[in-house]
């Protein structure tokens, strides 16, 4: 590598955090094509995945938890796509053209798996992409919480599929019908907070990637940035009243496990 590897990573993080186009990278960083080439290389050979998974295990151990989670939370987010590319679709419910980010997180919000697919793919089909083979990676995982968008009174087939094919007990967290508008649902708020972490990286505010694999890699890089800072004792997250309340809720729920 002709350029310092740390500077290459700094350039990739600059693109992630600021949302700038690769070609607009400042001249005091490495040339944009060099940074993009290494980002693409590390996406293809699984480097981002390996680094991410190692850091996640270290964070869980540092928090006094087993590296292998036993429960998780599932959710999706539709991201508008400005560019063309692979796997672009129309989400009729959100009236958005782009891709869906399906993520599975542990009970503290750390990413376990991310799958990016066309926004036209329904929630139940997207959930199967995430849960298929998940226990091969996380053998202790037995319970997954999700919202009511994954099942309805007519079609509850995903619950049976999860038990039969994934060995997972999928538990739906219902909304309170008496409350209108936004609700903070037990367990479910954890994955929403993870989406908010990702949203602080402007590259992830929308989907700018041409390939779903690169979109998944950007999610991993965002979590790598977050977890590396956490292990180093650095605070890169805003600490307002919302974050303080979220931390209190998390501590309460973890103490009950």
Where is each model-derived feature located?
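Short alpha-helical elements
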Residues: 1-257
